[in-house]
Amino acid sequence: VKLFEHLQKWITAYLMHEKPRTNVPFCDFDKLSYEIRPADVLLVEGRSRISDFTKSFTQSPWSHAVLYIGRLHDIDHPILRQKIKDFYKGEPTEQLVIESLLGCGTIVSPLAKYKMEHIRICRPNGISKADAQNVIAYAVERLG
């Protein structure tokens, strides 16, 4: 069992190893941070080995997607807000995303994590605030 766990950790670390940045990101992160809304999806051009495989397989520059959930005060439901606090120990004013990462599961991360990455906003057309909160609730329930 320990050998299998060791091998699994090694493979995960190998696949998730990120290459250094080779160029300046193509987006204005400050503008994106201002314009993004809860339930927007951010497409990310990843730099890991698994990202390279995904980009090759899908014939797309995007290898990762994250769900923007806003700041803690943007979450209407107090139970969901508490669950996010259980998974994220940073500042309550931080802009947050939910993402799934190989070897980590579904986690809460600061939007600022992607400041130097090539990212784009993907926004559902005409989504209501209630629908956006439902999408966020669905993602929050899957943390862990």
Model-inferred region functions:
Residues 1-144:
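Cysteine-nucleophile amide-bond enzymes
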